[in-house]
């Protein structure tokens, strides 16, 4: 398979899985909508979301990144971490705690002195991935162990000053 096509295909799969998980997890808890609207889809959506999370967990590298060029940016691990969070998973417990923590550690490990979160293939430019990373870290702030919390508290102000 041609390398460019393969990279595009892997990126496309990741983006679809991440956004599918985020979309269905967020919509399942919508306020003011009768439960009957979602109940008929729940048996189809929940297993699909779980399969997506399992895929992301299996695909994650030991260092917290993901395969191919775009998976090494800070944006993809941040989006994947938010996908786990959107289904109610926590960095301190549960089947995906290790995956979430690897996402956190990867992002924190790739912050420059300027505050910029950048690693690997920047794709649309370094600010694209950078802007996703503080959103993820803001979401996990307060849910992590004290050491990670300290690192997040130090990293976020520097990151936000760039935006």
Name every feature range the model reports, one short phrase each.
Residues 2-4, 26-163:
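Preference for long, amphipathic alpha-helical scaffolds in soluble/luminal domains
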Residues 1-12:
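N-terminal secretory signal peptides that target proteins for export/translocation
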Residues 14-26:
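Bacterial N-terminal signal peptides
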